[in-house]
């Protein structure tokens, strides 16, 4: 009798190029390096009260079509140039989707959206798209879901997020402590702050853990700790973007002796999954800024070329989300201008 005990539930295995292979195949030039380095520094300056602008991470819930993503980026790059005096715009470029149960997990996992799971194609598409976006002079931000995929793209990422479902994970806290960009950590799906604040404290410190290098070797990695970590309020059972919630969050951050910068996600629990409700969230944030709030440093908006969302099918509408519903382009411009005006008027007071 064969008593097999190893990998008994692995039913398929396909080799994926090592990160260094794609990094060498699609290298970044000095202009892109300068953009990423500079944007990371600008976000850090905002987080540490040395730059009075607001940074705004805005874009599709998830990337499923690189053509529409690039068209969106072209439009957003123009807004970034127009409004850069008051707000620093970073495109939301999410390639991986955490799922509560099951579902499409994103461009890297299943780029053809047909359950063929061509991850080798997915990581290549992701890197190429990020380079194309950066060539427009537009920085990119993403969510980090695992410790392997960042090795393919982090040199082109200016800001990153640890999501509500992974904020309590030791692996993700260790990852955040070693990532080269500022990192936002979301409050839990129930709206609680503890997981995010504990995550910030952990990510601030050095960690030693097993990880993979760009050469795909397993190695002991020691991190320096990341002082550019901050909380993201994404709501929960109830929204938490209002003044009372922001003030109670500030109190909790002070008591924990971590960075007091707050980013507000206008979508998810704060919009109660209704994409049009992002607009009143942005209005509230703008009012709080106008009334002197110095701790709201960042905003996140889910937006696409066309509003709403659609179910996955063989004939997808161009420029519309296949995951969470997003606001359309016209509303996006209105919200960006509203936030920019709030910063501008606050300076004039």
Annotate each PLM feature.
Residues 59, 264, 328:
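Conserved, mostly hydrophobic/aromatic
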């Amino acid at each position: 009798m064969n008593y097999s005990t190893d990998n008994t539930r692995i039913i398929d295995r396909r080799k994926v190029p090592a990160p260094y292979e794609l990094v060498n195949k699609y290298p970044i030039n000095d202009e892109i390096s300068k953009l990423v380095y500079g944007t990371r520094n600008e976000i850090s300056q905002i987080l540490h009260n040395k730059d009075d602008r607001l940074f705004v991470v805005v874009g599709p819930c998830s990337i499923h079509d690189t053509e529409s993503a690039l068209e969106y980026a072209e439009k957003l790059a123009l807004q970034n140039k127009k409004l850069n005096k008051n707000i620093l715009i970073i495109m939301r470029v999410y390639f991986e989707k955490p799922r509560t149960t099951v579902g499409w997990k994103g461009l890297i996992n299943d780029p053809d959206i047909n359950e063929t799971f061509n991850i080798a194609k997915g990581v290549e598409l992701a890197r190429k798209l990020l380079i194309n976006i950066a060539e427009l002079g537009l920085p990119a931000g993403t969510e980090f879901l695992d410790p392997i995929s960042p090795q393919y793209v982090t040199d082109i990422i200016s800001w990153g997020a640890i999501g509500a479902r992974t904020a309590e994970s030791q692996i993700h806290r260790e990852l955040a402590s070693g990532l080269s960009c500022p990192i936002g950590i979301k409050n839990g799906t129930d709206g609680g702050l503890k997981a995010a604040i504990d995550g910030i404290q952990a990510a601030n410190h050095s960690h030693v853990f097993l990880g993979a290098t760009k050469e795909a070797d397993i190695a002991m990695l020691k991190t320096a700790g990341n002082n550019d970590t901050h909380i993201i309020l994404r709501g929960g059972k109830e929204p938490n973007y209002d003044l009372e919630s922001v003030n109670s969050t500030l109190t909790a951050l002070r008591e924990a002796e971590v960075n007091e910068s707050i980013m507000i996600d206008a979508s998810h629990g704060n919009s109660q999954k209704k994409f049009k409700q992002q607009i009143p969230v942005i209005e509230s944030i703008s009012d709080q800024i106008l009334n002197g709030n110095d701790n709201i440093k960042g905003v996140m908006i889910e937006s696409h070329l066309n509003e709403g969302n659609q179910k996955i099918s063989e004939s997808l509408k161009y420029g519309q989300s296949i995951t969470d519903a997003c606001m359309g382009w016209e509303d996006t411009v209105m919200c960006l201008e509203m936030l920019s005006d709030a910063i501008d008027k606050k300076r004039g007071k």
